[in-house]
């Protein structure tokens, strides 16, 4: 009997508490700390808040801290973009100073490179002209060191006198390529071509016919009217 009376009292108490209770939805943002005393609300609100809302509160706090910094970040970015040319110029100045220090440290090697720089550029563009220009400096060197310049000029290494003779005839050969008539009328060129004549008689004959050859180049009609040439031909 006592057990029945106890159960009846329990049911009455539960019904009374259910009628007077305040219900908060699980996803509601109403703080539970509002039911606490004012001096405890600030300390306990973060603990008593719904755990589902805690990540959302953290995101709001992070966004609130970032948004005021956004204009400052944009200003700093624009300032950095404006300073990029200055940074590039500073890097160029540093590089130039490094090159100057390198030149001062090895001035002899730098001067040698500057002397050969035009020849190297010409060699990459026109190898034939480059090889022709390479012959000119080595013709002035002593013939006692032919093996050192073998890759540059094999003729100078094998036969130095013939190479030097060709270097002396180089201006006249260029004249022959530009103007054959002017080249043949040069009387001072005849001693250079003595090696072409097979014997002394032929050389003397060429020397005698040299004035007539010049006349044939300047005026062929008058050249064929010469009696000496006519007698020699007929």
Swiss-Prot record:
Assigned keywords, A-Z: Repeat, Seed storage protein, Signal, Storage protein
Signal peptide (UniProt feature, chain positions): 1-21
Superkingdom as given in the UniProt entry: Eukaryota
Coiled coil region boundaries: none
GO MF term list: nutrient reservoir activity
Pfam families membership: Zein
Homology family: Belongs to the zein family.
Miscellaneous comment: The alpha zeins of 19 kDa and 22 kDa account for 70% of the total zein fraction. They are encoded by a large multigene family. Structurally, 22K and 19K zeins are composed of nine adjacent, topologically antiparallel helices clustered within a distorted cylinder.
PANTHER family: ZEIN-ALPHA PMS2
Known function: Zeins are major seed storage proteins.
Protein name as catalogued: Zein-alpha 19B1
Lineage of the organism: Eukaryota, Viridiplantae, Streptophyta, Embryophyta, Tracheophyta
């Amino acid at each position: 009997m006592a057990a029945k009376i106890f159960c009846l009292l329990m049911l009455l108490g539960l019904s009374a508490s259910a009628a007077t209770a305040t219900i908060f939805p699980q996803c509601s943002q109403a703080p539970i700390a509002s039911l606490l005393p004012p001096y405890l609300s600030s300390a306990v609100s973060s603990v008593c808040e719904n755990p589902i809302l805690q990540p959302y509160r953290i995101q709001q706090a992070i966004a609130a801290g970032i948004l005021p910094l956004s204009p400052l970040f944009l200003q700093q970015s624009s300032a950095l973009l404006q300073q990029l040319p200055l940074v590039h110029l500073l890097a160029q100045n540093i590089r130039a100073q490094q090159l100057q220090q390198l030149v001062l440290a090895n001035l002899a090697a730098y001067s040698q490179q500057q002397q050969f720089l035009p020849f190297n550029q010409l060699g990459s563009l026109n190898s034939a002209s480059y090889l022709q220009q390479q012959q000119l400096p080595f013709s002035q060197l002593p013939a006692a060191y032919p093996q050192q310049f073998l890759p540059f000029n094999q003729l100078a290494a094998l036969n130095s006198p013939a190479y030097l003779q060709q270097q002396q005839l180089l201006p006249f050969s260029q004249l022959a390529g530009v103007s054959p008539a002017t080249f043949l009328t040069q009387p001072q060129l005849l001693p250079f071509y003595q090696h072409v004549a097979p014997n002394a008689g032929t050389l003397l004959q060429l020397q005698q016919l040299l004035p007539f050859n010049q006349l044939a180049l300047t005026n062929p009609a008058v050249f064929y009217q010469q009696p000496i040439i006519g007698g020699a031909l007929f």
